[in-house]
Amino acid sequence: MLTLDTSLPRTVLRGEEYTATPSGWILSHCVWETASSALASAPLPPCVSAKGNPVLLTQAQTQHRGGEVKKDDPTPNPLPPDYDGWLQYAAFNNTAGFDSMTNKMSVPDAPSSRPQILYLFPGLQNINWIPAITPEPMKAHFDIIQPVLQYPYLSADAEAGAGDWGLRSWYVTVDSGAKMSTEIIAPAGDVVLCNMTKTGADGSWIIDAALASSGKRTTQAVTESRLITQPWAYVTVECYGCKGCSTYPQKPLLFTELALTKDGAAVPSIAWRANPKPQPKQQCKEATKIISSTDITVTFQ
């Protein structure tokens, strides 16, 4: 069962409302939540414009580029208005695609200042598109699957603390919208066990994020023909509404035990590249260091 999301940051562009997802701004009426307990793949419904016409989602690159978008938050921002999207990442391409990607991802300390939304994740894509850096994909069939940490935690939960992160599993497209699993609390200092595994030749995948401390997890299943080959792997820092360098953690983000497989075997000769298409006007001290084929560290301060 799918329900429309109401928790994530929204903004208005050219008369349409957009939601900040971990792959850019998507029309809000096309961003859905699926219950983590429902592991049968729930297909995304058709995405249509406000006038009821089928649309290809051309995402707003930022929430306030070109003066077309009014910010929901009037707080002064010391960073440039287009300082969002993928701000740090590492990439690896295997033309034959992947059958799984697994890793551990640390849960950093909470930023001292609150961004609109900060996303941290590993992910698998079908094309090499970098939100807010490379031109938007104007053809259909772009996708990404990803277990995602987000700050702040946004769901209503009496147990959530001010410094807690949220954790979900995501599937995002630019022509059919996005689908996310139920948000769970991810406390700072924990570790996320990330798992994206292909379960069928028809493009079926399980996207799973579990907490090492408790075993709590948030999972979704997806089946789409566009997912048959996912040849691009990433680890990423993505932000929307970052209001200065204090909207980053103090501690590093650690991606460890990275593993990629194809046809039942480990992918050989993995060579990650740090920021091959970098943020053009970096303002903070973000940096990505490739420690090895299995370990990548992102620092913020």
Which ranges hold each PLM region?
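Exposed, interaction-prone regions of secreted/extracellular proteins
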Residues: 1-301
